[in-house]
Swiss-Prot record:
Name of the protein: Putative uncharacterized protein YOR263C
Further facts: Partially overlaps DSE3.
Length: 135
């Protein structure tokens, strides 16, 4: 079974941003799942506080959605040195995710600190050809 995914990995762990998408569990294209991680101290800057609160209050088996974007907190990863932790979230987007992604990027653009504006430029050009097909 092939899995379509597009990932963005920064050159520095300190920036702590990782984005990945894949087909849903049934292998169909009806929904795309995106997951990303950010250092905990960046959460308030990267996501509107209401979204963060709703996300963090949901259990690992539940998701909460706002405007068609569904967040699910899944795990906390601590780096080998034990100094850096990242919280991972899953994002469920409908099949017509391009328009919603533009809105999502706008949210990031409005809430990102200046030093992290580069993240917008990385994730803005979401098109199907950006996805790599791996058998």
């Amino acid at each position: 079974m092939s899995v379509n995914f597009f990932s963005l990995i920064t050159s520095s762990w300190e920036r702590g941003l990782f984005l990945k998408s894949c087909k849903n569990n049934s292998g169909t294209d009806s929904n795309r799942f995106f997951s990303f991680s950010v250092p905990p101290n960046l959460l308030d800057n990267l996501l509107p506080p209401l979204l963060v609160r709703k996300t963090l209050s949901s259990s690992s088996s539940k998701s909460c959605g706002i405007g068609g974007i569904y967040f699910k907190s899944s795990a906390v990863n601590v780096s080998e040195d034990g100094l850096t932790a990242s919280t991972f979230f899953s994002i469920l987007l409908p099949k017509n995710f391009l328009g919603i992604t533009k809105l999502f990027c706008r949210i990031f653009l409005l809430s990102c600190p200046h030093n992290y504006k580069w993240f917008i430029h990385l994730i803005n050009p979401f098109e199907y050809e950006n996805f790599i097909n791996i058998e």
